[in-house]
Amino acid sequence: MVKNKGLGRGLSSLLGEEVLPIKSEIVQIINIDKIKPNENQPRKHFEYNKIKELADSILNNGLLQPIIVDNNFQIIAGERRWRACKLAQVLEIPVIIKNFDTRESMETALIENIQRTDLTVMEEARGFKYLVDNFNYTVEKLAERLGKSRSHIANLLRLNNLPQSIQDKLNENILSMGHARCLINHEYAEEIANHIINHDLNVRQTEALVRQWHKNEYKKSTNNTNKVGKLCFKDNIIDNDLELLVKALSKKFGIKITIDNCNLGGKLMFHYKDLEELDLILSKLN
């Protein structure tokens, strides 16, 4: 039997409590239809391909690690294995029944899942929020119980304040946690998020963009038939083609030329010292 390194070691180290190895538990064979997923399970997204791979393995080798359930046959740990067994059309599976109350079940399910590398940031954040909202956990208590830093817990909890559309982009890895943190509690978070995606901004560029916003370095377009101002962000991020164009124009006219680029367009600016230089620019333009 394969030793479950993630669960056994994880519970011992994170909860500071002794966790009995599987061999000391009573394993029962239960009809798979009696087993129910935990509605408070932090993990909400299961990749079909990975479940299918696990199902194929179970068909060839059997379920090597029993699923842990509570007295109501609700899954505490092992929902991926349960889903794989369902996909493989396994009728009966080995389970270990734990006499846990709701609090213990949720804690165990959360801890079992946050040890997995494929848990999304938002799934982890929602799991933390559930414990805070339902069991009066503080950031300090969560950090102590989970073996995480207080700053990590606090930062993830704040992600729950993001609009749902941005949370979805986090789950889909369209935006990173670094991007999302810049948008927390921002009035125009969704508009800025779309700008980040459309312009492929990194976190450093996103931070600069938000700083510009707070310094009022943005404009509102008046060309909106719905009279809703469209945001125009100053990028200060010029792609290579634009940069080469500016250098070529500066060389051609012999003056300083700058470009102010934003998501709705931009401005090309000629800098002249006096009217004589302005006349020279105009003559070259003609």
Swiss-Prot record:
Cellular compartments per GO CC: chromosome
Superkingdom of origin organism: Bacteria
CDD domains in the record: SPO0J_N
Gene Ontology molecular function terms on file: DNA binding
Any one Pfam family match given in the protein's UniProt record, by short name: ParB_dimer
Protein's UniProt keywords contain DNA-binding: yes
InterPro entries listed in its UniProt record: Chromosome_partition/occlusion, HTH_ParB/Spo0J, ParB/RepB/Spo0J, ParB/Sulfiredoxin_dom, ParB/Sulfiredoxin_sf, ParB_dimer_C
GO BP annotation list: chromosome segregation; positive regulation of sporulation resulting in formation of a cellular spore
SMART domains registered for this protein in UniProt: ParB
Keywords: Chromosome partition, DNA-binding
NCBIfam families: parB_part
Similarity annotation: Belongs to the ParB family.
Cited PANTHER family: CHROMOSOME-PARTITIONING PROTEIN PARB-RELATED
Record function comment: Involved in chromosome partition. Localize to both poles of the predivisional cell following completion of DNA replication. Binds to the DNA origin of replication.
Protein name: Probable chromosome-partitioning protein ParB
Organism, scientific name: Rickettsia typhi (strain ATCC VR-144 / Wilmington)
Gene: parB
